[in-house]
């Protein structure tokens, strides 16, 4: 009888743990795939980033005492503009996105990137 109670408790515990739903962290917090964006039914890239990787839109660092820093957006290797430009880029037209912090963005694209950059990668 005692072993039957233990077995019943173990079964209930396993069932409860197995049914627990939890959020899974993104595989790479510096990348965002088209699949992730489409899975959540986003149509434009800005809304996807604002919802799934909101930290990418937070300005950190300054370029000078007079001007506030800006996060730059690149489409492949071409500067698109500010993050607002992502509103016009459709999720279906991109393969993935990559975030660069200020140091990495400055190393890649030069001075004026202390706030970082977001690179939109097309289907090549």
Residue ranges and their predicted role:
Residues 27-46, 72-80, 122:
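Short, polar/charged loop or turn motifs at beta-strand boundaries
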Residues 65-103:
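Periplasmic plug
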Residues 1-19:
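Sec-dependent bacterial lipoprotein signal peptides
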Residues 39-64:
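Post-signal-peptide N-terminal segment of Sec-exported extracytoplasmic proteins
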Residues 55-59, 80-82, 103-108:
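Short beta-strands and strand-coil junctions in structured, solvent-facing domains, enriched
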Residues 15-33:
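Bacterial Sec signal peptide processing site at the extreme N-terminus
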Residues 94-124:
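A beta-strand signature from Gram-negative outer-membrane beta-barrel systems
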